[in-house]
């Protein structure tokens, strides 16, 4: 062993001599380095820096670990090595040794507080696989104040860095511990998922394997390792003895290695490339530093090459290490080669040296510019509003603006987390001692994605693009004064000193800027891995949860003492060519025009400065032109969901390619027909076939009529069939079969009986046409007129004086060519009437003269229900917007009618967008910019006001129409009702959003359309007060029944059309005494007819257009109304009398009593649904209630349900549908049960039920199903309030009204659901009245009100004047006649009154009075 020690000592001495010679030669030509303030040298005991160097050649054996027990088996070797290292340290006085740096740290106490572990930076695993020629020296401060970082977290951080960084010379002042915590567990799963992407790096050499950092935290593990180290030491010593015998060859190799190691040390000294070692307080961190240094300085070679390993001794206990403060490091080999300094041989020795020289030359400014001209680096610059995200797994890019909330999980940010964890760990770094240079290699051309060379195969590897985002840098000075951008973007250098005055920011966009200070103590990582929270001080709390994508913090002032995170965007002033990795080069705006963002549920809308945007406030300001969404914003903010994109792409690929990946080329479809194809007309049914069908229907009806009333009827009828039923027998009964004989007259075909002679008959009765055919012919003449020209879409010449000015050129009709011929005469007249009231004239050249005229204002279109008021209004709006495109029309209607308006716009192919504010669904015609902003939010995060504001904004910014219901308009724009009682006033908190919407809805509409304008007729209601305060005076009121209950309500409706006329109308009513029509007055008097009505008509004439519905009478088959007075059975009469007694006692709640009577008149069992008073219980006892409960499903216990069941059965035979109305829900539910029980029908198929609780879409679905002639629907049960207005139920030809209401307009509206344009059958209506109940007098009052309405609203249409008001009455009703004549059903009927509301029949209503 003494021999071994002598040989080692001699070889070491020779090695030192060679080192000194080389040092003197290289100090002659020093390399210029960045200016740095040298610390004062302080004497130090160099014995504390002694390192044990044990040469070994066995790769499989880990380096020995030095401990207190080391001197037992090998004391001589230890003493030899100690003397050698003491001599070595004496000779190293000329260079900046680690001990000097250690002493320097003592002089600078800030250094110790800022230092942290190398393992926190992740140097080991970040650079281990492919980093070559990195010489690292690590000075160690004695003490560190930052502690308590677990080995697991440090190890995880070291595994996160990119393994493909080549030729990195790193100068970092390393603290002893990191303040970064709780990061490893959140991002450990990313270790093996994706390969990091570093652009512009050329890797030429393989690197050693992974280095595992050992920890001394467990004493048992340390003891085992020390024991194994002792054993292996002797084995290595024996190998050394054998290697000595090899002679001078091995000596020469050792000399070369010594020279090379000395060169690397000198280079590190000259280039100021050092890495400070860890403090002894953290053994794991110390191991991490040593392994990182060795790994970065190692280079690859062949398997058969020999290696000389420099193994550093093990550290001791923590207390001893604190005293010694020596840079003791301990490494261990794991799976691959140990930490060594590799000997280079052959060609592999030249390239690393050349690279070192190249790095040294880059420190010169002039040479750097030349080098930069040779190597063109593509730098990606992006604005903060268009940030590029790259998936850490697949490399796919996306752009967008994420939110800054701490709970936000940003997609595609995993790679950012991997890189930024290390950067945030540097918040407490003291200073950068030297520069960091990255050799990025050369790139050819201008590829959108850089390529990395594979060190093994030499081939180029396509790596995903580095996300081109603005990443802040690390500044760790005491007083950060200035930040400058370097000239060369591809070779960033960072200069730092004890007091840094100038920091040059590197161009690498992947380094976040973190300003830290001495007192920065803790950086906490929240549970969500993508957004680290920073809790450093009270002032730094505002910085928490800031994202890395552009949110800026206040600038760092001089003398900053708190840790602040900033993400300011660094402008790039370099003249390098711009290239974004997604294919857009030299023009970053191209990318901006195709921004696509994932629709994340928690994303917030950010503006160009990456600040959160208040969508509602932005749209409100845009409406009032305080701010505006421009075209650029519209293009930038359009959103395309990632799922939608992937699905669309998958569908597109499926269409283009087959299973084998080949392109599918489909031939174009063959054209079977050429030219313009006309739509197929329905098959023409001959008269013979139609007559045959009619005969079969009559046969079926006769057969079914024999079955009604029970099964015994058919047997009785069969017995009575005999010779008495022959035609002769019928003639004897007076039932003749008449026909027209032109020579005789109207005579019987069988017996020759002449009922009327030919001379007494009118010529019109000779025709062969029936009444229906005659109406069809008249309608054809009226609609088509002269006109073949009308079929071609041109207006037929009209010689009428009244129409002369209309058809002339220069009128509003020219704005809608071809539409006039499609309108009915009353619609054409109404169209011009609206123009004259709102615009003053129909002549285009005179419109400007009436813009501010007092003659213009609102108008009322009082057309009969079903005569096409909606169609007329749509045509007017279409023409009005052509002349006044800045007009903002608003349509206010009941909620159930808004869908009808939308359907009408589609039906007539109107291109004007219609925005339904009462619906939260979008039509696709909204403003793309506003809709794009809203779609960035998840559906659950969108408020109703934001959705409504998008529609309002779309309505304001384009030529469109806004629709809203009365209830919603009252909610959004309503004013507080001060007249109501205190208990009715709701205290509502001030809502800024509602105030903004109210201001828009009250001030911006230029035209107001009120459908069913009789709805807001109460002067004390909130909706009436709100509508009367709308700024615009251009209003159109649509109502088929403007007169509802009294003249006061009529005056309120007229006042909405012309607010200026309200006082005049009120005074007229007071003078004429027409207020007597209020409820409770019995006598109307003749004064109203003679004086008051005429005065009121004179006031209304200029702005009220009336059409009584003559177009319906001339175009539709006909209408037959009948009041059916029924006799209730015994049980029902008993219950009705009990309630009637209470009613006669003048109970206070009259409406509650009327409700009971209406329910019991339908079925007596419904009394259980009502609240029975104590007096009523005297008559309606428990026994009666139990009996009623048993007969609940028996329709024969009520006269109305019995009539309805038999009636529906007969209508089913003749294939006619029945529409049943009631003002209450309970009767309709009971009738549905009766129908289902008797006919075995299914609810929703044969029986449809509509009530007020249904949504608008469900209502429209039921309507369409019932009107479909091919559907199974037989009966439609409807609530009077739910569907008595606006909707079309032309599928029904039989209408039954179960109860009587006070308002005559309600019944008229209900009847008009079936009797309207589009009806193809005669409509029969039945008003069911129970005898002996208050329903008779109520109906009389209703008839009187209807008569007054007829007198007030006289026909004002030119087309109606001179024509008969009432068309030919329909006298035949075979269904009702059959029921009345039936022997078992005749007892139900008490009386029938046909056409009861005619003027000559009003006085005859006394028959209905009890």
Swiss-Prot record:
In short, the EC number is: 3.6.4.-
Position of motif Nuclear localization signal 1?
22-29
Q: Name the positions where ATP binds.
A: 863-870
Provide this UniProt record's keywords sorted from A to Z.
ATP-binding, Coiled coil, DNA-binding, Helicase, Hydrolase, Nucleotide-binding, Nucleus, Repeat
UniProt GO BP: gene silencing by siRNA-directed DNA methylation; positive regulation of post-transcriptional gene silencing by RNA
Has keyword DNA-binding? yes
> Where is this protein chiefly located?
nucleus
State where composition is biased (Low complexity): 276-301, 576-587
Where are the compositionally biased (Basic residues) regions?
1-12
Coiled coil where? 248-278, 356-377
Positions with biased composition (Polar residues): 95-108, 428-446
Q: Where is the Helicase C-terminal domain?
A: 1206-1359
- Class in the EC hierarchy, top level: hydrolase
For this protein, the record's PANTHER family field holds:
SNF2 DOMAIN-CONTAINING PROTEIN CLASSY 2-RELATED, SNF2 DOMAIN-CONTAINING PROTEIN CLASSY 3
Which family does the record assign? Belongs to the SNF2/RAD54 helicase family.
Function according to Swiss-Prot or TrEMBL? Probable chromatin remodeling factor.
What protein name does the entry list? Answer: SNF2 domain-containing protein CLASSY 3
Q: Which gene encodes it?
A: CLSY3
